[in-house]
């Protein structure tokens, strides 16, 4: 892992949810989705000691029992004291461990059923949803005249740049996981949740760290810059996980600028998540509001992906159809059953591009 560092939190964009007053979702994302890093090694404060029994006050001298009885009482008293001390230490350590575990959601292998749900969404569901969602969904920014992306000498390609703590990345990963499963097979997908202290607290999602997509059509690379593990004593900071390669960094730096993203920060920097589909379609910030995933387990979300009337599914698959249309444009319409589907064709029409 790379060293930790500290940066301000800003940037990002996402649609304003229906009926939500006050600060818009777009502004909220801009204020919270810029990469956050940490200074120094992660660590927690030392645990406080437990309470040990306090001996009672001495009273007037009592008649002394026989020596053998005194020895037995002393022995049993010592055993009891040891048992109490062990119990206290156990409770203190258990409490300390629970407190530490509550500060973030660990990354663990994705359950097989969740991965299967993501990979086996019926085509009829994709088509029924198309680009129709009860929740607002932002379209990717479409570029023209740019060369196809090359990563590790392979083209076409798609690049994702985000962080495990980021709630906007949490929402976007559901759409990416479903869309990319139409073009290949996932391996080593993990589950986790966004920050427990950021907005849209503990949004359940995937982690793409260490995950791979085996696809004959597209090269996919993911960079999870930071974990969701807080750095002690540095609010809003998380431990570093992964750095972009020089090739990936050049793509991120170029296409996250205001030249290609009208809403990019004038002060520079990249908004999480940043998604570049073959230098054709750019996503900066969440496509839909992660708030709609509040209270949903991984299984709740994945098991609903086959239901085109589910509002959460509609937001995820609308975003996924937009991504699929951009990928299909890059793969020259392959695979045919995906790229000629009515859902992808509707997305391509909405984006003003061809899906073949």
Predicted regions located by residue number:
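Short glycine-rich or small-residue beta-strand-to-loop segments that form or flank ligand, phosphate
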Residues: 157-163
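Conserved redox-active cysteine motifs that mediate thiol-disulfide chemistry
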Residues: 163-174
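Non-globular targeting/processing and membrane-anchoring segments
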Residues: 2-157, 171-173, 181-356
């Amino acid at each position: 892992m790379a060293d930790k560092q500290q940066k301000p939190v800003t940037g990002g964009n996402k649609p304003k949810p229906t009926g939500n007053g006050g600060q818009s979702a777009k502004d909220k994302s801009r204020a919270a989705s810029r990469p956050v890093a940490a200074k120094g090694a992660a660590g927690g404060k030392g645990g406080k000691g437990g309470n040990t029994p306090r001996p009672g006050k001495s009273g007037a001298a009592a008649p002394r029992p026989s020596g053998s009885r005194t020895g037995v009482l002393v022995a049993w008293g010592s055993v009891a004291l040891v048992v109490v001390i062990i119990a206290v230490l156990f409770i203190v350590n258990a409490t300390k461990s629970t407190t530490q575990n509550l500060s973030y959601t660990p990354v663990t292998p994705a359950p097989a059923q969740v991965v299967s749900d993501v990979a086996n969404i019926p085509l009829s569901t994709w088509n029924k949803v198309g680009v129709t969602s009860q929740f607002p969904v932002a379209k990717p920014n479409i570029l023209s005249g740019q060369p196809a992306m090359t990563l590790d000498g392979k083209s076409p390609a798609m690049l994702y740049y985000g962080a495990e703590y980021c709630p906007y990345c949490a929402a976007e990963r559901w759409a990416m996981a479903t869309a990319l499963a139409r073009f290949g097979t996932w391996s080593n997908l993990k589950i986790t949740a966004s920050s427990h202290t950021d907005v849209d607290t503990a949004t359940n999602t995937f982690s793409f760290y260490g995950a791979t997509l085996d696809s004959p059509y597209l090269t996919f690379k993911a960079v999870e810059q930071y974990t969701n593990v807080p750095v002690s004593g540095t609010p809003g900071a998380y431990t570093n996980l992964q750095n972009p390669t020089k090739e990936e960094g050049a793509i991120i730096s170029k296409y996250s600028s205001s030249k290609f993203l009208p809403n990019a920060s004038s002060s520079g920097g990249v908004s999480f998540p940043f998604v570049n589909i073959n230098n054709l379609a750019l996503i900066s910030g969440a496509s839909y509001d992660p708030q709609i995933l509040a209270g949903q387990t991984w299984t709740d979300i994945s098991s609903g992906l086959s239901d085109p009337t589910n509002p959460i599914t509609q937001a995820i698959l609308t975003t996924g159809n937009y991504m699929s249309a951009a990928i299909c444009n890059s793969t020259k319409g392959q695979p045919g059953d995906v790229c000629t589907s009515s859902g992808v064709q509707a997305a391509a029409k909405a984006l003003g591009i061809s899906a073949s």
